[in-house]
């Protein structure tokens, strides 16, 4: 018999294995490889928003006050886009515009590009986080795939649209009232509400809200009664082995209400995923079209008839006049450097005037 003395040589982990072990360790807040992208980018994006809305003026870019320091509140403060003259410059702090001067960089709108780019990568990092965790616990990746909808909307609105226009100036500023103004701009300059992709987006988002309400109410209505009494808050103590609610009862109820009903839970939940995500993707595609100045529906025959016949008017022709008014007012206000002057006689007037 042979006895070997000594230690078994330990395999040395390389740097990748060491990092992988630390990053994917089970802890209260999972980090993961995706966290290397998510956490720094989210930190910088949120920090940029808080810094900009607290201290930074938009006087040099838009001629408005936009910070708490200047008297704005939560709804009116914003991190505003750079001036139109800066076009698509990345506005790096060390670039030729700011030349390392932080105050100058803020005045030029550098915080907006900082927040927009870090925000986009933070959202992508969050989607990768869902992929990574799903793989770790052996789930399918539908959460991550669904989150591509909000990412598509953010990237199309904040990055692709202004890239198709003359500069970052025409993107939305990061603020509540600023976003509302951007929506009015979209309506006036692109007739966005009559765009079929916007219609599909509205149908998707509102349809998803309806499906969510119906589904939640139906599950609550058909909870199985058990020995402890059926109540909503047993959800926080999920010890039962059997089904939580009766799909058969729910199917019978909605069959009587509508004549048709979901009979398969997988199809039902896929449909609840499909409706909002498809709506968001359609909206994003529509905004990419607007970046290229593609037009919405035009009912030219109604416009011609309204111009010829003072007694003929439709809600469409009234909206077209409204859009002209928005353009006339917003162009002069938002682009003072263009010196746009509209004489009274060219401003839109309804047939009644």
From Swiss-Prot:
Keywords: Acetylation, Chlorophyll, Chloroplast, Chromophore, Electron transport, Iron, Magnesium, Membrane, Metal-binding, Oxidoreductase, Phosphoprotein, Photosynthesis, Photosystem II, Plastid, Thylakoid, Transmembrane, Transmembrane helix, Transport
GO terms classed as biological process: photosynthetic electron transport in photosystem II
Chain positions found as N-acetylthreonine: 2
Domain of life: Eukaryota
CDD domains for this protein: Photosystem-II_D2 (cd09288)
Residues noted as binding chlorophyll a PD2 in the record, renumbered to the chain: 198
The keyword tRNA processing is annotated on this UniProt entry: no
GO molecular function: chlorophyll binding; electron transporter, transferring electrons within the cyclic electron transport pathway of photosynthesis activity; iron ion binding; oxygen evolving activity
Topology in membrane: Multi-pass membrane protein
Entry GO CC: chloroplast thylakoid membrane; photosystem II
EC numbers: 1.10.3.9
Family listed: Belongs to the reaction center PufL/M/PsbA/D family.
Protein name per the record: Photosystem II D2 protein
Source organism: Triticum aestivum
């Amino acid at each position: 018999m042979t006895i070997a003395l000594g230690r078994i040589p330990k395999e040395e982990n390389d740097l990748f294995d060491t990092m992988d072990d630390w990053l994917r360790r089970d802890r209260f807040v999972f980090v993961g490889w995706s966290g290397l992208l998510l956490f720094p980018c989210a930190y910088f994006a949120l920090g940029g928003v808080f810094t900009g809305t607290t201290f930074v003026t938009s006087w040099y870019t838009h001629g408005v006050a936009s910070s708490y320091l200047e008297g704005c509140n939560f709804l009116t403060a914003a991190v505003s886009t750079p001036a139109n003259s800066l076009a698509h410059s990345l506005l790096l702090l060390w670039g030729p515009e700011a030349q390392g001067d932080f105050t100058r960089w803020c005045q030029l709108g550098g915080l907006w590009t900082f927040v927009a780019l870090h925000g986009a990568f933070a959202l992508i990092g969050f989607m990768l986080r869902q992929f990574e965790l799903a793989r770790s616990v052996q789930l399918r990746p539908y959460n991550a795939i669904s989150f591509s909808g909000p990412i598509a909307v953010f990237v199309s609105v904040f990055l692709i649209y202004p890239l198709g226009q003359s500069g970052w100036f025409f993107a939305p500023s990061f603020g509540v009232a600023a976003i509302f103004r951007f929506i009015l701009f979209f309506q006036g300059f692109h007739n966005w509400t009559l765009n079929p992709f916007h219609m599909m987006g509205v149908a998707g988002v509102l349809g998803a809200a309806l499906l969510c309400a119906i589904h939640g109410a139906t599950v609550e209505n058909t909870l199985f009664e058990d020995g402890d009494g059926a109540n909503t808050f047993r959800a926080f103590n999920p010890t039962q082995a059997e089904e939580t609610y009766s799909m058969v009862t729910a199917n019978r109820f909605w069959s009587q209400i509508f004549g048709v009903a979901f009979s398969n839970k997988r199809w039902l939940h896929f449909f609840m995923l499909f409706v909002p995500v498809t709506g968001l993707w359609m909206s994003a595609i529509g905004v990419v079209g607007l970046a290229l100045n593609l037009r919405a529906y035009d009912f030219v025959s109604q416009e011609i008839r309204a111009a010829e016949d003072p007694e003929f008017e439709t809600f469409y022709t009234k909206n077209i006049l409204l859009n002209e008014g928005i353009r006339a007012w917003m162009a002069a206000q938002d682009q003072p450097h263009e010196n746009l002057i509209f004489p009274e006689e060219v401003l839109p007037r309804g047939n009644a005037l």
